[in-house]
Design a protein with these regions (language model features):
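Alpha-helical transmembrane segments and their helix-helix packing motifs
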Residues: 11, 15, 104-107, 200-203, ...
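Domain-scale recognition of functional cores that engage charged ligands
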Residues: 1-244, 248-261, 281, 305
Length: 423
C-alpha cells in the first residue's frame, strides 16, 4: 500500500497518481492499525495484513508511541518494523541523507567508494564545527546562507545579509554556542524558467532535481527530472521539495520513445474477480457520504430553480404561499423565518434572499454546505474517481465560487447558474 498524508498535503496528487498508476492501494493513517504485532489494513471484509508499506509520511509522524513529536501515525508501527513483519519503502531515517552536512563530505565519500571524482561539483559548504571553516564563515557571513547541519523538519534557512545588526549578532552567538549544529553554504544565482502565473508569463528561479536508479548492475541516471519553481530564490533553499510549483523536465530526442505502462507489464489473460470486500472502510464511508451530499446538492439546486423561475415570471405572490417555499425551508435551503407569518416581513425580499442562500455558509443543510462536503470528500477519493468525475466536481466548485455581498447574482443570473449545474 502507499501511505499518504491525506488530501491536505501538497504531495497528495502525486501520491494518488503514483498509487493509481502502479495499481497499489492508497491509504491514510486512519486506514491502518496494528494487531498482534502485524500491520493491518481496515477493509469492509475485516482486517487484511500489510506486508509492504510505501511511506510518504514524514518520519516524525509515523508512530505516536515511540516518536514523541508525532501527532499522528500508526501506534506500534516501529515495533512491527523491528519484528520484521513489515517492509517499509522509503525507510524510517532515510531523511538523514538530505542533511546539508553531507555536502561537505561528498567528494571524500565518492573517493572512499572508488567512484571517482564528482562529475557535478557540490555547492560550497562549510561546517562550523571545523575551526578553519568557522573562522571563514564569520569573516564572510554576508556571502553565505546558514542552515541546520542535520535536517530536522522544515527549518527555514537564515540569510545574514538580510538581517539587522542585532539579528546578526544573535545568530553569531547561536553558532558560537553550538557550531556543530550549523553549516554555511555559498549563495548562488539560480537560473530562471518561464512560468505561467495566472494571467501572464513570468521568469521564476528554479531548482532542478535529477534521479538515479540503483540496481545490482550499478547505477543509471534518468533522463529528465523535476524542477521546483518559486517567485523568489529563497523559497527553494529550504528542502528538495520546497517551492511553489513543480515542472517536468523533458529531454528532447531524435526519435519517439517506446511506450511503457506499468499496468500492462505482464502478458497473458487477465482473470476477473470481485474484490469489493478489500475496499478500505474509510473509502466506503466517504463514497456513501459523497453520494448523499451530491444527492442533497442536486435536490436543493432543482428546488431552488423552481422557486427562482416563479420569481422570474413575476409570481412572487404565488411563491410565498406555495409548497415550494416550504420545501426549501424544511430541507434547509433557506432560512425557516421566510415562511413564518409575522417574521418574513422583517427579512429581505425573496428576490434577494433566495439567490443569496445559494452561497450562504450559515445553512448547514444548504446548497453551499453540501457542495463543500462534496469537494472535501472527493479530494480524499482522488485516486478512485475518474478524470471526468473530477472535472465535473471542479467545474461545480468554480461556478459556485464564494462571492462578496456586492457581487451576488440576481434572480436571472442565479437561474442560469443552476441551469448550468443541473445540465
Amino acid at each position: 500500500v502507499v501511505w499518504t498524508k491525506g488530501p491536505g498535503s501538497r504531495s497528495f496528487f502525486e501520491d494518488a497518481y503514483l498509487a493509481r498508476y502502479l495499481g497499489y492501494t492508497l491509504v491514510q493513517t486512519d486506514d491502518l492499525a496494528v494487531r498482534n504485532n502485524q500491520l493491518m489494513l481496515k477493509t469492509l471484509g475485516g482486517l487484511l495484513p500489510v506486508d509492504v508499506l510505501w511511506r510518504r509520511v514524514n518520519d516524525e509522524n509515523c508512530d505516536p508511541v515511540e516518536l514523541h513529536s508525532s501527532t499522528g501515525g500508526v501506534a506500534g508501527l516501529l515495533e512491527v518494523l523491528r519484528s520484521g513483519n513489515v517492509a517499509i519503502v522509503n525507510g524510517l531515517g532515510s531523511r538523514l541523507v538530505e542533511s546539508p552536512l553531507l555536502a561537505v563530505w561528498l567528494p571524500k565519500i565518492a573517493e572512499y567508494f572508488s567512484l571517482g571524482p564528482l562529475q557535478l561539483p557540490t555547492k560550497p559548504t562549510w561546517w562550523c564545527s571545523d575551526e578553519n571553516s568557522f573562522h571563514w564563515v564569520m569573516a564572510h557571513l554576508h556571502e553565505v546562507v546558514i542552515l541546520p547541519a542535520f535536517r530536522m523538519g522544515n527549518v527555514a534557512p537564515l540569510y545574514p545579509a538580510d538581517m539587522s545588526q542585532a539579528e546578526k549578532q544573535a545568530l553569531v552567538h547561536r553558532i558560537r554556542s553550538q557550531p556543530a549544529a550549523f553549516v554555511a553554504q555559498q549563495k548562488i544565482e539560480r537560473s530562471t524558467t518561464p512560468v505561467w502565473n495566472g494571467d501572464q508569463v513570468k521568469h521564476w528561479p528554479l531548482a532542478l532535481r535529477g534521479f538515479v536508479l540503483g540496481s545490482e548492475g550499478g547505477h543509471r541516471t534518468l533522463q529528465g527530472g523535476l524542477a521546483r519553481v518559486a517567485w523568489k530564490p529563497q523559497l527553494l533553499d529550504q528542502s528538495p521539495t520546497s517551492g511553489e510549483k513543480s515542472q517536468d523536465v523533458w529531454i528532447q530526442g531524435h526519435r519517439s520513445a517506446p511506450p511503457t505502462d506499468a499496468a500492462s507489464s505482464t502478458a497473458g489473460p487477465i482473470t476477473l474477480k470481485r474484490s469489493g470486500t478489500e475496499l478500505p472502510s474509510r473509502v466506503a464511508d466517504s463514497f456513501f457520504w459523497l453520494g448523499r451530499n451530491i444527492e442533497r446538492a442536486e435536490f436543493g439546486a432543482r428546488l431552488m430553480r423552481i422557486a427562482l423561475q416563479l420569481l422570474l415570471n413575476e409570481r412572487e405572490g404565488i411563491l410565498e404561499g406555495s409548497r415550494v417555499l416550504r420545501a426549501l425551508a424544511e430541507s434547509g435551503q433557506i432560512e425557516p423565518d421566510l415562511i413564518v407569518p409575522g417574521m418574513k416581513e422583517t427579512l429581505p425580499v425573496l428576490t434577494s434572499s433566495l439567490p443569496r442562500s445559494l452561497f450562504s455558509d450559515d445553512l448547514p443543510m444548504g446548497f453551499r454546505s453540501s457542495l463543500d462536503h462534496v469537494i472535501r470528500l472527493s479530494a480524499g477519493l482522488r485516486d478512485r474517481l475518474s478524470t471526468d468525475s473530477w472535472r465535473i466536481i471542479n467545474r461545480m466548485d468554480a461556478l459556485c465560487a464564494r462571492r462578496p455581498a456586492s457581487d451576488l447574482p440576481d434572480v436571472a443570473d442565479a437561474t442560469e447558474l443552476l441551469d448550468m449545474l443541473i445540465s
